[in-house]
Amino acid sequence: MIQAGLRIDVDTFRGTRDGVPRLLELLDEAGLKATFFFSVGPDNMGRHLWRLARPAFFWKMLRSRAASLYGWDILLAGTAWPGKPIGRELGPLMRRTQAAGHEVGLHAWDHHAWQTHAGVWSVQQLGEQIRRGSDCLADILGQPVRCSAAAGWRADGRVVEAKQPFGFRYNSDCRGRGAFRPRLADGSPGIPQVPVNLPTFDEVVGPGLPREAYNDFILERFAAGRDNVYTIHAEVEGLLLAPAFRELLRRAERRGIRFRPLGELLPDDPRSLPLAELVRGRLAGREGWLGVRQP
């Protein structure tokens, strides 16, 4: 049996409203549980269109055929009109996810703002964004938030420090191999991190890998004897690619891949996890910097 953590990022209003119910159906059909990370504040994701001036982002959007993949309502959200408040309007879907037995955590208050400004915000500004998102999601769920995942994996040592006061059991803020405890500025271990170590659809699909070949590509990258942490997006696998994701789940089962929530990948005693640094790095297929485990 190959154990794998399944992380579902929910970035937008439409992804929550339309993608989450579809994913809940598919996971129930497969008898699986996963971790959903919700964005709960305003949906301003359309403001990323201004990044088209950057060649790397323009190429990524062109390579993944973003307009057909996401839809124009997602690509324009929060541009010509105020972003819709996701948590306030769609909180019942987050409670439904929790009631179905899935792990629920915080992705962001404002996904666009975090992805755009996390690199320059102070620790205090980062903490305020985390507080707003955590308080909102806790009110929706009726219980404290126990895990989080930085939007766009935009995390570094400052983000690690900013999350310390919130009492999360773990965070999934970076890319890299194996769960670890990030080293804080004073040298002490921080809240455990569960990194993602498998590529996402939008990072690899393009002229060299057509959509139809993606399932073959990704399934070959799961391996026994290590942590396998895979991320999908409600806006992608919960909408246009839902049929392909259903087929992926069926094929994964036949290969002995068993998906579970990320929290179940942690040892009973987190003190057994190795210490490592969480630093800024680069990853093929993604525009800009992101958090990576080192070493």
From Swiss-Prot:
SUPFAM superfamilies: Glycoside hydrolase/deacetylase
GO biological process: 4-amino-4-deoxy-alpha-L-arabinopyranosyl undecaprenyl phosphate biosynthetic process; lipid A biosynthetic process; lipopolysaccharide biosynthetic process; response to antibiotic
UniProt domain NodB homology: residue ranges: 2-260
Gene name for this UniProt entry: arnD
Pathway connected to this protein: Glycolipid biosynthesis; 4-amino-4-deoxy-alpha-L-arabinose undecaprenyl phosphate biosynthesis; 4-amino-4-deoxy-alpha-L-arabinose undecaprenyl phosphate from UDP-4-deoxy-4-formamido-beta-L-arabinose and undecaprenyl phosphate: step 2/2; Bacterial outer membrane biogenesis; lipopolysaccharide biosynthesis
EC number, as in UniProt: 3.5.1.n3
Entry similarity comment: Belongs to the polysaccharide deacetylase family. ArnD deformylase subfamily.
Aminoacyl-tRNA synthetase listed as a keyword: no
Name of the protein this chain belongs to: Probable 4-deoxy-4-formamido-L-arabinose-phosphoundecaprenol deformylase ArnD
Protein role: Catalyzes the deformylation of 4-deoxy-4-formamido-L-arabinose-phosphoundecaprenol to 4-amino-4-deoxy-L-arabinose-phosphoundecaprenol. The modified arabinose is attached to lipid A and is required for resistance to polymyxin and cationic antimicrobial peptides.
NCBIfam families assigned: PRK15394.1
Annotated GO CC locations: membrane
Superkingdom per UniProt: Bacteria
Catalytic reaction annotation: 4-deoxy-4-formamido-alpha-L-arabinopyranosyl di-trans,octa-cis-undecaprenyl phosphate + H2O = 4-amino-4-deoxy-alpha-L-arabinopyranosyl di-trans,octa-cis-undecaprenyl phosphate + formate
GO molecular-function term, one example from the UniProt record: hydrolase activity, acting on carbon-nitrogen (but not peptide) bonds, in linear amides
Lineage, highest ranks first: Bacteria, Pseudomonadati, Pseudomonadota, Gammaproteobacteria, Pseudomonadales
Keywords: Antibiotic resistance, Hydrolase, Lipid A biosynthesis, Lipid biosynthesis, Lipid metabolism, Lipopolysaccharide biosynthesis
One of the Pfam families matching this protein, by short name: Polysacc_deac_1
HAMAP family: ArnD
PROSITE patterns from the UniProt entry: NODB (PS51677)
